[in-house]
Amino acid sequence: MRGLLCWPVLLLLLQPWETQLQLTGPRCHTGPLDLVFVIDSSRSVRPFEFETMRQFLMGLLRGLNVGPNATRVGVIQYSSQVQSVFPLRAFSRREDMERAIRDLVPLAQGTMTGLAIQYAMNVAFSVAEGARPPEERVPRVAVIVTDGRPQDRVAEVAAQARARGIEIYAVGVQRADVGSLRAMASPPLDEHVFLVESFDLIQEFGLQFQSRLCGKDQCAEGGHGCQHQCVNAWAMFHCTCNPGYKLAADNKSCLAIDLCAEGTHGCEHHCVNSPGSYFCHCQVGFVLQQDQRSCRAIDYCSFGNHSCQHECVSTPGGPRCHCREGHDLQPDGRSCQVRDLCNGVDHGCEFQCVSEGLSYRCLCPEGRQLQADGKSCNRCREGHVDLVLLVDGSKSVRPQNFELVKRFVNQIVDFLDVSPEGTRVGLVQFSSRVRTEFPLGRYGTAAEVKQAVLAVEYMERGTMTGLALRHMVEHSFSEAQGARPRALNVPRVGLVFTDGRSQDDISVWAARAKEEGIVMYAVGVGKAVEAELREIASEPAELHVSYAPDFGTMTHLLENLRGSICPEEGISAGTELRSPCECESLVEFQGRTLGALESLTLNLAQLTARLEDLENQLANQK
């Protein structure tokens, strides 16, 4: 009958199962495979027949390459119900699978084959049970072993399983219904339907089934993995190597016979093995001598094409230029520039650092004197001010630059008289949102403020400067946040640091801040927009807007900011002109000078008008 493999009792013509189990060498290598056995354990299967089926399963396992990345095996048994013996994910060792099969107890009820196929399709071959995902394209194979006619329908559910990519082998024993076997199996039927006359012959089917899974010529299939040569044998193979090589421990790779390992090569640096021979090789930056064993360093500087401005140093990787002390190598790798110690060291200058050869010195602004420590300058007169710093923490600033901003803020704090009665300092960071790092009333000393500044964490994200200005106006200068009452006439100063264009509108709250009497300063770095800086700052912009091309040069702004933020306590009604080096006196001096100029300008205009009137009268008399 076409499509049906009958197994007559011709044991002498077939190799016994036990002989197959004793074969040595590599096991069957089918590649990755998800294999589920569906075993009929209904009451019609007698105990000794079930034991034969148990031995059949264990024998078939011994011929498979079992492992998480090779063949995964699951077993289910069924009668009137379905029971999972072990899923695909349960075991990766053959010994554990055999132990579970030995403990298998038959269910001894009806024969619901369709129910078993449905369970295999929906549960046993699910990813949760250990089947590999469909995108990995690992074949899914079900082997159904039954001895009777199903008591439910199998054709429709088997078709669904095949449509999901499950390849079905149907093995019938003794009284099995041939029509049901054909309805379950995958095409071509003559390769997927087997009929065994008795349980005694089911082991002989195992040989044929294993041969069908494994193929006959593993070397020809190309999956053997031999590096040099594959020698095929029945259901097995072994690898050999070309002359001059030996087989590695994995029995697939080939290693050159290492003549270098004998230690008689005489190579100064490296010995490189080749089939039947060897040669010497030097490290990078060295050349092999005529004796083909010793090595000499290459003097790249002697070639005369290094173009180094100061000195050339030969290294194994090639020529390297080196600069004399007090100079730094430039990005071109050749030229040298005098080192700017002010940018390269923590100089500690309060105002300005000036590099001088291999050293540096600190400078103070006009009207202020350098102190004995050679770094600090005498302070402006102590005064009262509430100062809120708005710091841009957007992603464009970047973490390393944010640290420079914090250092810059602390340099401003250094020249302030920080105390509850003197200058109070608050800090707000903004990006896509606004966060008060510490309010005006929290810290009473400069040391506490500086420590809190260093602890501020970088926010990243966007640049909502308008939102930050609103927060400052509505919250930061409130008495609840530590600002002093307006009745005390303590100046309120806002200082904004930003490096880019705001992502929201700033005009409303920039104007509102000035209406509230807040003196606004704007410090821009890098790509900061000048128009926005001017809109934020108070008038005149020349005194309230500062700009630096990058974060590394912000320290040059300190002198102007220190002179500008120094508090004003109001102009005295007296006419005495005090030293303009003091902030209050300087403002008073400038104010009175501007007032005098305005008065002179008005008088000049009036005098000019009177002269024009006299000229007109004289012209009329003539």
From Swiss-Prot:
Disulfide bonds: 219-230, 226-239, 241-254, 260-271, 267-280, 282-295, 301-312, 308-321, 323-336, 342-353, 349-362, 364-377
Chief location bin: secreted
Isomerase listed as a keyword: no
Glycosylation sites: 69, 251, 305
Position of the signal peptide: 1-18
A GO molecular function held by the record: calcium ion binding
Subcellular location: Secreted
Function: Major component of the extracellular matrix of cartilage.
This protein's name: Matrilin-4
Organism: Homo sapiens (Human)
Record gene name: MATN4
